Amino acid sequence: MEYDGFPLSADQYERLTTDDLMQLLTEGLSDNPALAEKEPKFVLAICHMLNDKAQINAEVRRRRTFAIISHPDAGKTTLTENLLLRGGAIHLAGQVKARGDRRRARSDWMKIEQERGISVTSAVMTFEYKGVICNLLDTPGHEDFSEDTYRTLTAADSAIMVIDAAKGIEAQTLKLFEVCRLRDVPIITFINKIDREGQDPFDLMQEVSDKLALDTAPMTWPVGQGNRLKGIYDLTQNEFISYKQGETPENTGLSVTSNEITRFLSDDELTTLKEETELAQGACSPFDLELYRAGALTPVFFGTALRELGVDELLDAVASFAPPPRPQPSSARDISPDEKKVSGFVFKVQANMDQNHRDRIAFMRLCSGKFKRGMKLKLSSSGKSIGVHNPILFFAQDRELVDEAWPGDIIGIPNHGTIRVGDTLTENEDLIFTGIPNFAPEILQRVRLDDPMKAKHLRRALESLAEEGVTQVFKPQLGANWVVGVVGRLQLEVLAQRIEAEYDIKVAFEQAPYETARWVDSDDAAELKRFLDGNVASMAEDRDGAPVFMAKSAWEVGYTEEKWPKIRFSAIRERAPAAA
């Protein structure tokens, strides 16, 4: 691969973009017409690289990896069901709180999720729609599980934000939006539940614009709402989609100027529709693909997921203009999807998805290259290579072995605890994907075991569940009790139920003598040792063995920081381990 004209290594050539390779080859042949004759292997190798990149790029362009975010009860799970229905992943859409023979929401597979009708863990579902491969990440809506949601958003290239038409933008929606903004994740807005009485659509558009500091581009518009709902109007196609309660929405193909539209709308309704759509298009921004993908503009769709109105238009938008897989930041460089070597990162580990097998699945977002079943990948946390022999694609609990996968795909890797959240897997490259955080817990509780004979089993259970990254586990330097750290109290309930259901161990939680925790480190090793030795009663280790300062109050954190200026106290810790 090397000669005097282009003295680069093979790896460096492979990292070049398609345009750069084409320019290199064109200029090389132009400057030296005899290049192909003198260096046939070099020219052939460049041509092979171009062919490989073309194959990868063709698959990348077909993929949309997106998350759905919302406040609890905004209708996210119902929307998820309807998207899956349209993608052929399921054949019957059911309500979350099902009765009789109606099915539970397919993405809510954990027992407590089924009982409460909320998502507390991120489900990954893959389906095809109009030739586009959709990788849908159904994130937890409950605020106690925001950390899991944050990590899931690191794997998404775009997001659908679901807003309740009656309630507008709620607290959790705003928090999740800020996470998307930090990562420059473009957002499509779906204003849901227009079959109920809600806020004025202009007020909702203004709220999105004001609270999120985004330009808004209306793509569909409601024709009435609540009992007066007659459908939606597709502003991009100038078509009226009719709705009647109890019937499937019908795309009439009629514009507001068509005489036949009066079969569906009264004169007053038609006049209102004309006035509102004209005002909406005049007052709001036109859709701009570049602004949307830059995170500066959100296209807005109206509908009701429960009645299946507006869902087709939303999914068409995802397929048409949501971004394909993007370059991902790493410790070495931004990794382009069309790089030949395979790379990916683990944003989630789920234990015991199958009660019969006590399994542990690592969810890996592929970032570059063509993945093939059976290939060996280097694990950043250990530096060792592991064979990926049984990679799987997901639909809730349903699994399917996959022979190949491409950038943007989410594959599951069964393992016995060797792969952890934040791990990078590469085709023998020394790099680490960045931006997968661990947050300091807001609630700390001691674990009380009813049966002391099961202490070893409890340790295994806690370590296994901690690998999922939602619940954190700390071992104090003094005392025998484990301490768990969570964001909200619902997590404690989930933890206790899962330990009992999956490990047959009954536990209870009691108040720990700590209020908060901070990871500590220092550039001065001697100073760090003095701090650790002088604060043994307040020190613990997390599951990675990192030292953690357990404080009785936020005031104590501040006081200790002033007392030990050379020690760093961190509320957020990067989960990616140091490369071996």
Which residues are covered by each model-predicted region?
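Generic L/I/V-rich hydrophobic alpha-helical segments across diverse proteins
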Residues: 21, 39, 46-47
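Charged, low-complexity interaction regions
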Residues: 29-38
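Intrinsically disordered, low-complexity linker/tail regions enriched in Pro/Ser/Thr
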Residues: 1-2
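Short, charge/polar-rich alpha-helical segments
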Residues: 6-13
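Short amphipathic alpha-helical heptad-repeat segments
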Residues: 13-25
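Structural and coupling elements of P-loop NTPases
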Residues: 49-580
